Structure formats: C-alpha cells, structure tokens
Amino acid sequence: MDTRFWGPSGWRLLHLIATAPPRRQTRAFFELLPYVLPCKYCRSSLADYYAVDAVPSTNFAPWLYRIHNRVNGKLRDQKLLKTPNPPWSTVKAEYEALFKAPCTRNAMIGWDFLYSVVYTTPCKAVPSEPLPDAPPSETLTTPELRNRWNTMEREERIQFIGRWWDLLPQVLPYASWRTAFASGPKRPSLTEGHKAVTEWLFQVEQRVCRALHVAANHTSFGGLCRKLSVFQSKCGSKKTRKTKTCRSSVAKGDIGKVKQTRRKSAFFNST
C-alpha cells in the first residue's frame, strides 16, 4: 500500500497509543509492528531500527519519537521528505495536548492505516518475494531474519498479524475506543483472505462510530474497496535496491485529497 496513504494515519494513532498511560499489552503490540506494516520495505527497515533501539518495557513515547526520526531520515535520503524533525519537547507537548483534548476521544483515528493492514493480509496466490540481496534461505533461521528479508511463508506471517489484531483493542488510548472496538464482530481467520478481513474491519468501524456518536468515514464497503485499490502499490516489484518505499502510481489529485487534512509537521506528514 502507498505509504503516503497510510503513513500519517498510522503515525498519529501509534504516537497517541505511546503517549497514553501504558497498558500491560502495549510492549507486545509494538514488538509485533515490524511483522504487520503494509509495505515490505517498511517492515524490513523497522526490523533494522528495532535491532538498535528495542521496544522498552515502559515510557514508549520518546522511544517511538526516536524510531520515527529514523524513518524520516530514510525518507530524506530518498529525497521523499524535506521537513526537519521537530524537537522532542514539541512532539511531546503536541501529543500530550492531543491526548487530553476532549474532542480527540470522541472519534477514533487511524482507520486508513488499519485498513491498509487488512487489505495487505497475505494471500495464498501471492508468495513473498525476497528483498534484493537476501541471504540464502537456510541461513534465515529466526522469524526476525525471515521478516527482515521478506521470506516468511504466509502461514507464519499471519500468526504474527493475528496476534497484533488481538492486542489492538486492548492498547487503544481511550476506554471508549477499547470498549467499542471489542464489541464489534469477531475477526475472521486471516486464512480467509484480505476481503473477508477488510469487510470485518468495515463492520467494526461502523460499530465504533455508532458507539462514539460520530459519522463513519466510509459508508459503503464497495466504496471503501475502490478507495483502497487506488492506493494499492506493487511495493517495489522491480529488483533494485533503489526502491525502498512502497508507492503507487496514484494520481496526484488523489494524494492531494489525502494530504488536505494533515498538519505541516514531520510528525504528522511523514510516511
């Protein structure tokens, strides 16, 4: 999926989770993130960043700030980001204010990111394509290495993704979000494919929005699927080390619509 579509949505949700009082499941939730991102290059890069800056047992907000800075640095190297990183004090103040704002808890955020995760649920018909220069498969003896080089079999990856989905409703930053999300329909098995899981999340979104008394961003499943297909990316199908971020051939006008509601900060705009 195109990182310009899901990146800002994901960062905003993840920073809010990291800013909220930590819950028992928060560390495990973040530890599973490198297996879940809807872009193979993003999963690989995040695995590298975790190797040098592991998920802490508490105090997640400054750690996620450092991880986000590493992602921004990668994008600058690729000439995909021009804005500088704001200081930690600014980011800390912004997200603490956002967390405390009464209007924030009234409408759950992060849906574009969550839909991108379900839409890229591994499918039987599409085997994983190893990253360029991947070591021989027999040397990739741990899940971390197989994830790093995108050689995981479907059956193995969906185990990690399934655990992440199970943890999500437990780590959301507000009790009202957690209750509404958990009261939605039961998630189907990921082996049923991305369409079934996307339809499940659509039903969850409708349930959450009704519970929070706000209008849903998506009013029809067909319309949602058309939107997601626009931002679908081949994720660097050409075997070159120059391709390091998933981008689609989406029209500039569509990307412009996504950017209209974003703030001019590296921590709200970066992908």
Model-derived segments and their meaning:
Residues M1-V36, K40-T271:
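Mid-to-C-terminal functional-domain signal that highlights helix-capping/loop sites
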